[in-house]
């Protein structure tokens, strides 16, 4: 992960820890205290007394627990929904991408999505495998092709909305697009995936999971809504 990506995810954690403040307020506050361009290294040097002295709100309630979350985010100790895990001696057997604006709820439209949260699954369960962003730099490819290539190692994509042409594009990349009901959390959908994988897989999914003998074919699980076939 580049420094730019590391900075982005730390800042996202900070924005979520300080919902009473606008993102621009938080950036200006930290930039003022650091005295330099914000980098992961500069964020980690900031102290709570230093930040408290210039806190940009007279109405936001800063409890010890909230300060603890802020300082942890500055130092790179991100909350569980933003913390990549590398469990020893476990190999991903299925990867699912979630299009989300916050890493908590499946609330992204694929054609507008900029953040993708990749979860890996095996017989023991799932874990946050990677965090990916739609690139900000100019690119030659069509936007949804860029998104498809960003998650092309995944077998499933969960989003709130997706258009027909975009769904067809994903299927050409051997990614199955799935629409989640409004308000569905990533955690709830991961639990549904675990339940599915503990039983028998639908043929269209089992076909893409070569070398897995524990997961067998079955009818399609009603936990999921298939966008296109």
From Swiss-Prot:
Its Gene Ontology biological processes? nitrogen fixation
The membrane-spanning stretches of this chain are: none
Q: Name one Pfam family in it.
A: Nitro_FeMo-Co
Q: Does the keyword Cell cycle apply?
A: no
For this UniProt record, the keywords arranged alphabetically read as follows:
Nitrogen fixation
- Has UniProt tagged this entry with the keyword Protein biosynthesis? no
Q: Which Gene3D superfamilies match?
A: Dinitrogenase iron-molybdenum cofactor biosynthesis domain
Q: Which family does it belong to?
A: Belongs to the NifX/NifY family.
Name-wise, this protein is Protein NifY
Query: Taxonomy-wise, where does this protein's organism fall, top ranks first?
Result: Bacteria, Pseudomonadati, Pseudomonadota, Gammaproteobacteria, Enterobacterales
